[in-house]
Amino acid sequence: MIRKLPLGVQSFKDLREKGFLYVDKTEYLFRLANSSKVYFLSRPRRFGKSLFLSTLAAYFRGQKELFKDLYLEKAEEEQAAQEGREAWQEYPVLYLDFNTGQYELSGALDETLSYFLDTEEPKYNLQKKGLSHAKRFTSLIQAAYQQTDKQVVILVDEYDKPLLQTMGVNEELNEKYRNELKAFYSVIKTCDEYIRFAFLTGVTKFSKISIFSDLNNLRDISMEKQYAGLCGITQTELETNFQPDIQVLADEQNLTYQEALAALKQWYDGYLFHPAGEGMYNPFSLLSAFVKKEIKSYWFSTGTPTFLVNYLKEAHYYIPDLDGNVQLDEDGLQTYRAIAQDTLPILFQAGYLTIKKYIRDLRLYQLGFPNDEVRYGFLHNLLPAYSDVPFGQTGVWIGRFVQDIRNGNVNEFMERVQAIISSIPYDNFTDKNLKLREQNYQTAVYLVFALMGQFVQTEVHCYCRTATDGGGSMQQRCFGSAETRSQNYTRMYSFGVADCVVKTADTVYIFEFKLSGNGTAEDALTQIKKNGYAEQYKADGKKIMLIGAGFEEATRTIKEWKAEALEK
C-alpha cells in the first residue's frame, strides 16, 4: 500500500478525508482554544502554519468527524461535559489568507482585503463597499455575532507577507501597507466582545513599529516552551510516524536505517524555538526527502530574500559570526525594525538562525544555523553578493574548487581564490575603513571554504577579532569555529590552528592567509610551522600540504602563494 505523505497539503479537511498521514498536533489546539483568546505565532515559511490554521477552522466549525481517533476527539467531549455545554459547537469563522497575493504591485493588498470582505459580507446580508477596509471588517464581525448569536473566530494566515514582499524593494509601498494593516488589525481589539478566538500567523513580528501597537491584547506564543513543538516534526514524531519512509529512503540511498536517520537530522533538524524546547525538523524538507527519496536542499528553492543579503552588506556584518556566534537578548529576538542594523531578529524569525545556546546568567541567546540545509543554502546565496560569481553559478564555482583540491592542483585552486578576491567590489571605503574592506576579502574566503564543506571535509577557524598574531591573518577579524560536512562544533586544541583546513582522502591542506597586506607568503608558511598548526593532523597518516598566501593592497588581491609538503 502506498503511503500518502501530505507534502503541500494545507487543508485539514482534505488531509483527513483523503487518508493522508497526519502527525497529531491537536493537543496544542485544545490547549489554545481553552486558555487565552488572541494569539500570534511566528514560524519560518513552509513550517506547517497554514495546515494548523486549517485545523483550527475545522474545530471551530464543529467538524467532529475530521478529528476521529485524534487527541482532540476525546478531549473536547470531556471538556464539554465538565463545563456543562454542548461539544463541537459551531462558530462563525473568518479566514483571511495573504498567501496568494503578489504584493510588489501597489493594488495587491487592497485586492486581497476586498476579496475577503466581498466574499464574507453576503453571508451576513452586508453591502459596505463604500467604507474603509477596517470599518467593513468591524461591521462584518458585529453582523456575524448578531446573526448567529455566537462569538466570531478570526484566523489570519501570513499576516506579514505584504510587508516582507515590499521590504527593501519599495519602501513607500511598504509604509502604506504598514499603515493600512495597522488600522485593519486594530479592529480585533475594538471588537473584543464579539470575538471567541483569534489566531494570526506570520514569519516576523513587526511589533513596536506600529502594526501591533494597537493590538496589545495579543499573546505571542512564538517562544513559549509549551508551544515549541506546535509546528514542525520532533525526533519522536519522526521515528514514530515515518519509520517505513526512513527505511525506503535508506534503501534508495544505499544507507543503513541509522545512517539515513543521522543524515536527516544533519540536514533538516535543529530548529529551536525555546532554549528548553525540543529540536524541530523542517516538515516541508523532511516530507520532500521522503517523497523524492533524496536528501538535498528543498527549503531554499526560492532563494534568500534580496533585502536580507543587502541588509547584511549595508551593516558590514561579519558573515562567519552567523555560524554560532550571534548573541541577542529576548527583546532582540522578538522584535524587528526594517533597517539594516536590525537584520539579526528577522534572520532568527525567518528560520535562517536558531537558538544554539542560552546564557542564563546574562539572559542572552546564542544563535547559529540550524542545519546543513540552511547553512549551505544561505551561504550559497551570499557568495555572488560578495564577489563577481554570477547568481545561479555558485555551485559550479565551488565544484571547480573541490575538483582542484581533490586532484592536488594547488596552483589552480589558489588562482581561483585570487580571482574571487580581486573581483570583490571596492565599495569606496576610505583609508579609515580599510578594516571593512579587509573584512569583505575574508568573508569571500570564508564562503568558499565553508561551501566546499558539502563535498570535502573543511575547517574554517575564526578566532578573536582583536587578536594580534603578528601577521595580519584571518584570525584578526573573526571568532568561533565551524567544521562542516559531518560536524559543526567548536574544538579546543593544544596546538594553534590555521585559517582554513581541507581534508581529502589522502591529503590534508593547511592554509594561512595574510589578507591585511602586512605579511608575505613566506611569513604565512613560517607561521604555520612555528605555531604547530599541522601537529594535530599528523596522526591521520595523510600527506600534509602547507599553503601560505600574501595579499597586496594596491592590486586588492593575493600577490603570491607558496606551497610545500610537510616532511614526515
Set out the residue ranges of the language-model regions.
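Phosphate-binding site recognition
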Residues: 1-437, 447, 452-453, 464-468, ...
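Mg2+/Mn2+-dependent nuclease catalytic core
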Residues: 174-179, 515-534
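Long, charged, glycine-rich C-terminal linkers/tails
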Residues: 357-360, 454-463, 488-503, 512
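Feature representing long, continuous alpha-helical segments
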Residues: 439, 443-447, 508, 526
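Short beta-strand or tight-loop elements
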Residues: 441, 494-498, 542
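Conserved catalytic cores of phosphodiester-cleaving nucleases, focusing on short active-site segments
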Residues: 445, 470, 500-502, 506-517, ...
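Short secondary-structure junctions
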Residues: 449-456, 539-541
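Domain-level recognition of nuclease-like catalytic cores that cleave nucleotide substrates
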Residues: 536, 540-568
